[in-house]
Amino acid sequence: MTNIRKTHPLMKIINNSFIDLPTPSNISSWWNFGSLLGICLIIQILTGLFLAMHYTSDTLTAFSSVTHICRDVNYGWLIRYLHANGASMFFICLFLHVGRGLYYGSYLFLETWNIGVLLLFAVMATAFMGYVLPWGQMSFWGATVITNLLSAIPYIGSDLVQWIWGGFSVDKATLTRFFAFHFILPFIVAALAGVHLLFLHETGSNNPSGLSSDADKIPFHPYYTIKDILGALMLILILMMLVLFSPDLLGDPDNYTPANPLNTPPHIKPEWYFLFAYAILRSIPNKLGGVLALVLSILVLAFMPLLHTSKQRSMMFRPLSQCLFWILVADLIILTWIGGQPVEHPFIIIGQLASILYFMLILILMPLVSLFENNLMKW
């Protein structure tokens, strides 16, 4: 009798992706984040669905509907904080996943990498629109400031902004369309993640050494299923600790004040996971220049395969490149800190220096050091 797992059209896809998939025997815990991102996405879609059942996307009732969810709906507070902090966990996993890709040269899988960059943009767009929905002060002013950046586009800018707003300011039309997009985008993200996986399974996984692992593959199940379950339990533990002990740790207190177009908060800032990009945006005194730098801060990832000058794929055996990589990580942490600070001395100059260093490291220093390491190998 033939095994249904290997013959049934649907089961066959699952089998070849999660059960009999030949996997390198030496992939470390850094390879856990793909599955963790999948779990995060499922958590976000499920909690979001239940929140949408009680939420109203109207400027007059949005804020009070969120309050109603927290106070009157059974376990509404849990669903709301799982969704809010789930987004933070999502981005932590995303940053670590991208960092792993940069460190081990996974970006040389071109299709997988490019869809990954597209996924990053899609998730960032989803998170931004989700932050607008509670209609607190930071929701309203964050939406106003970020959408206004599009007015820097020459000629069509101001028309484009009004088209997105659906009027002359962020209002009911804006909130309604943001809710609609926030609902549909995660499903697009899920579809893209499927394509991401499809392309990955065309080539097989990379591994820490960056060398071919064809000679030493093991089945995904049970070895990596059990490893992924351990990762998932750790993720859920951290998420539940956040949700149950300090649910507002990563939020902004200003968002507990209903949106008021007549009163601007002293410091407008996005959620913590956008602060590094926000710091880069603010470090350039010109509006259009700032917007370009903001987009490039993420889009620069798409150029990584072109900037790869080393003869080795991974950084595992390249100590100089490792040094620069960890300087880049430290630089991103500094940018995140600066993004949350007021625009005054010394934060302005620190932000500008950190922004310059960010682009210099990726575009100039790392490719040059890789070439230098190639020459060192000849000795």
Curated annotation (Swiss-Prot):
GO terms for biological process: mitochondrial electron transport, ubiquinol to cytochrome c. It is found in: Mitochondrion inner membrane. One of its GO terms (cellular component) is mitochondrial inner membrane. A ubiquinone binds at residue 201. The chain crosses the membrane at residues 33-53, 77-98, 113-133, 178-198, 226-246, 288-308, 320-340, 347-367. Keywords: Electron transport, Heme, Iron, Membrane, Metal-binding, Mitochondrion, Mitochondrion inner membrane, Respiratory chain, Transmembrane, Transmembrane helix, Transport, Ubiquinone. Heme b b562 binds at residues 83, 182. Its main location: mitochondrion. One of its GO terms (molecular function) is metal ion binding. Binds 2 heme b groups non-covalently. It comes from the Eukaryota. Its cofactor is heme b. PROSITE patterns: CYTB_CTER, CYTB_NTER. PANTHER family: CYTOCHROME B. The cytochrome bc1 complex contains 11 subunits: 3 respiratory subunits (MT-CYB, CYC1 and UQCRFS1), 2 core proteins (UQCRC1 and UQCRC2) and 6 low-molecular weight proteins (UQCRH/QCR6, UQCRB/QCR7, UQCRQ/QCR8, UQCR10/QCR9, UQCR11/QCR10 and a cleavage product of UQCRFS1). This cytochrome bc1 complex then forms a dimer. Component of the ubiquinol-cytochrome c reductase complex (complex III or cytochrome b-c1 complex) that is part of the mitochondrial respiratory chain. The b-c1 complex mediates electron transfer from ubiquinol to cytochrome c. Contributes to the generation of a proton gradient across the mitochondrial membrane that is then used for ATP synthesis. Belongs to the cytochrome b family. This is Cytochrome b. The gene is MT-CYB.
